[in-house]
Regions:
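Intrinsically disordered, low-complexity proline/glycine-rich segments
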Residues: 1-97
């Protein structure tokens, strides 16, 4: 089972999870859900805006939204040639189906 995604966990694109549940936590950090937002990031002169998390569990919900896990994706940052980030790091103690 994949680890639960939380605020401050990193995505493969360089973003971090920025928003999460106001009342459900793992390891002292709010858990992330589908439609929560990532941070923006830049590399050199390139800048990528914040995007929403677009995947989550089909059977675990936090505040009526699918729970985000390691491997779940965020929206594409720009055009079809741009990268898509996936949650890379999650809770070491909470795992979600």
């Amino acid at each position: 089972m994949p680890a639960a995604g939380r605020i401050s966990d990193r995505l493969s694109c360089g973003d971090f999870i920025k928003t999460g549940s106001a009342d459900v936590y793992a390891d002292g950090l709010p858990l992330a859900r589908e439609n929560d937002i990532t941070t923006s990031h830049s590399i050199g002169r390139d800048f990528w805006r914040s995007v929403k998390l677009v995947e989550g569990s089909s059977n675990v919900f936090i505040n009526n939204r699918p729970a985000t896990r390691v491997g779940d994706a965020a929206e594409q940052h720009c055009s079809s040639s741009c990268h898509v980030g996936k949650v890379q790091k999650g809770s070491p103690t909470v795992f979600i189906n």
